[in-house]
Amino acid sequence: MYMRILLSCSELGLGHVSRIIPLGKRLAAHGHEMFFFSGGKAHEMLQKEFTNVYKCTPISWYENAHGIITSASLVNLFFPLPLFNMDKNRLEIKNSNAWETIHRYYDLRENIHDIAPDLLVADGDINALRLAQRWKIPSVYIANMIRPSYGFSAFLSPGERVVERYVKKCSKIIIPDNPPPYTISEYSIGNLDRLGLNAKVEYVGGFVDTTPVKGSQDHIFAPISGPPGTRGKLIKTLIPVLEKLKTKCVISLGTPGKKVSTKIGNCELHTWLSDEERQEAMRNAKFVIFSGGHATCFETIKYSKPSICIPTQPEQLGNAAKLQDLKCSITAKNKSQLQKAVVKLEKEQESYNRNMSALNEFSSKFKGLDRAVDIIETSLD
């Protein structure tokens, strides 16, 4: 049965769109007619890959050069705040999340009659689930965060309840992660039995192909990702530590566009790496330093690379904590902790390598993208 499928994804980081792109390509190859919604950088990336791509208002945390500011983000839920736009190098007023949410919903709704989807698939986009419920469109939710319990402000609990109300209306919930006890996003998903979601949830495995790939140990690889403020915070933490090491370091600054490269000490800095360049850098790394984003977690699993996580927001903090519990990673929050983590990881490299190999062996049993496609294609049966 061929369907008209609407896919909408959150643009908080690029992890959501990195899942939607291969999923959309696979579904399109199966003959389904695809329509895509997102905002910000995610919208730009979707436009490069597909034709039916619609722009909607992005929803974002309040962040500056120090990263995400929790207190300001709480205020910004309901009130606009001044914010320096680092991409455009000017002071602007950031609209409240309430304003962004309302406008995003109407952006989605504007084209719903013309698209007339048979199914709506949302990756981290609660507005799309709300639209599906209001317009009685069957829906599938893709998420690695449902009821976060690690580093998440208690003030946001009422918002979690609203989210859960829409999630419970889905036909199916796809978690692109390993089943327990090796679920990387365990601390961000929560107790599904208590939430009454167990019957709808399936852990399909990561969308990244985790078939083992052997490489060398030539350098330390630090792929930086996220919004400008997050990237700025990571750069300020990383470079002062890495430039003093004897080991070669490769740093990707996560800025899409024309590639520009330079050197600081023993560090190679690249504004952007192609998929092939990134894979090569990951494959030949001794270990990886990153923020703890879910997609990159599974890249480290694919190449069996131990890591150091420098989380900049609660979801990443939860992922980092789980990897640390599995003795596959070390969490660092500042330059001092990063320096100690590098020393510890180099000293105990063999032990961490063994743990990562065991995690890779378990993860490679699952083909998350294949299973997600099966679930979506049979969701209307």
Stretches found by the model and what they are:
Residues 9-21, 229-232:
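A short, glycine/small-residue-rich beta-strand->loop->alpha-helix junction that serves as a flexible
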Residues 330-331, 335-336, 340-360, 381:
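Conserved donor-nucleotide binding/catalytic region of nucleotide-linked donor-dependent transferases
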Residues 24, 202-287, 297, 317:
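Donor-nucleotide binding loops and adjacent catalytic segments primarily
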Residues 108, 112, 281-283:
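Short alpha-helical donor nucleotide-sugar binding micro-motif in glycosyltransferases
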Residues 350, 362-381:
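C-terminal alpha-helical cap of glycosyltransferases
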Residues 120-123, 277-319:
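A donor-sugar binding/catalytic signature common to diverse glycosyltransferases
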Residues 11, 30, 34-99, 268-270:
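Conserved nucleotide-sugar phosphate-binding/catalytic loop shared by glycosyltransferases and other
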Residues 135-203:
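Active-site-proximal region of nucleotide-activated glycan assembly enzymes
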